């Protein structure tokens, strides 16, 4: 009970910071818009790790879940064991959730099971580039290693904190470095979109820290500048990726 309460308090603190920072909310709004562009318009969407519930502003028919209780979510569930029927959702979305998973292979199997044929999963996750690797290693508590077997099944760790423990290098290893292995393990799934995101706007918001170095009024304009620069600088310093996976019809 104490562990569950601690995790709930951590999530509440994170959500409270988010709700106070308009600049950060504007960045996340742009993330949800990017995911929405690549999702199916029909059927229901499931969000894994919904936290503040702000996805409802972009997705109207959406069911929100998180690993600990939140007043903003519809249910509590473990992403490794999703409590839904087969082929139940047309879309699955998540932001900064995948790299916290202890066994991402199990999650992808579950996601494939509950997606309809033609269903899509859109994830926004950390991306390891020459510059971002420095930032993640020195300014984040999580590991940042891509020299791993991302498909390895790990024994359950009761001491693991699902909100804080993770590996920022996991998504890069899983979807980029081991892309061919991914498609062999999941022949029913196909990566249909990979896009580099985020250069400087998100760091200037301070993320979930209690400071912000930019006025919220500038965020949308600077995001446009960032989108212009990404084709030039993305391979060198992009901080995030958008990966869209489709279940074959």
Mark where each language-model region is.
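Conserved N-terminal segment of class I S-adenosyl-L-methionine
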Residues: 1-80
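A short acidic, Gly/Pro-enriched loop at the edge of an enzyme's catalytic core
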Residues: 80-92
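A short beta-strand submotif of the Rossmann-like class I SAM-dependent methyltransferase core
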Residues: 91-97, 123
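A short glycine-rich, Lys/Arg-flanked "PGG" loop and its adjoining helix->strand segment in the class I
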Residues: 105-120
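Conserved class I S-adenosyl-L-methionine
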Residues: 121-158
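Short alpha-helix
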Residues: 169-194
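Core SAM-dependent methyltransferase catalytic element
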Residues: 188, 233-249
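C-terminal helical/coil "lid" or tail adjacent to the Rossmann-like core of SAM-dependent
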Residues: 197-227
């Amino acid at each position: 009970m104490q562990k569950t309460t601690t995790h709930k308090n951590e999530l509440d603190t994170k959500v409270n910071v988010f709700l106070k920072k308009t600049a950060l909310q504007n960045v996340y709004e742009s993330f949800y818009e990017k995911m929405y562009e690549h999702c199916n318009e029909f059927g229901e969407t499931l969000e894994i790790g919904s936290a503040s519930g702000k996805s409802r502003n972009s997705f109207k028919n959406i069911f929100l879940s998180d690993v600990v209780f939140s007043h903003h979510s519809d249910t509590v569930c473990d992403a490794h064991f999703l409590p839904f029927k087969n082929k139940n959702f047309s879309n699955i979305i998540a932001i900064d959730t995948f790299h916290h998973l202890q066994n991402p292979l199990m999650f992808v199997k579950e996601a494939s099971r509950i997606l309809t044929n033609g269903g899509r999963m859109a994830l926004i996750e950390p991306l390891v580039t020459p510059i971002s690797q420095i930032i993640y290693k020195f300014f984040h508590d999580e590991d940042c290693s891509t020299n791993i077997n991302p498909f390895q099944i790990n024994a359950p760790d009761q001491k693991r904190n699902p909100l804080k423990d993770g590996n920022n290098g996991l998504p890069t290893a899983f979807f980029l470095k081991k892309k061919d292995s991914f498609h062999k393990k999941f022949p029913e799934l196909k990566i249909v979109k990979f896009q580099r995101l985020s250069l400087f706007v998100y760091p200037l918001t301070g993320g979930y820290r209690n400071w912000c170095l930019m006025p919220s009024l500038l965020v949308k304009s600077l995001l446009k500048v960032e989108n212009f620069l990404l084709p030039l600088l993305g391979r060198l310093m992009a901080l995030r990726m958008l990966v869209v996976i489709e279940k074959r019809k």
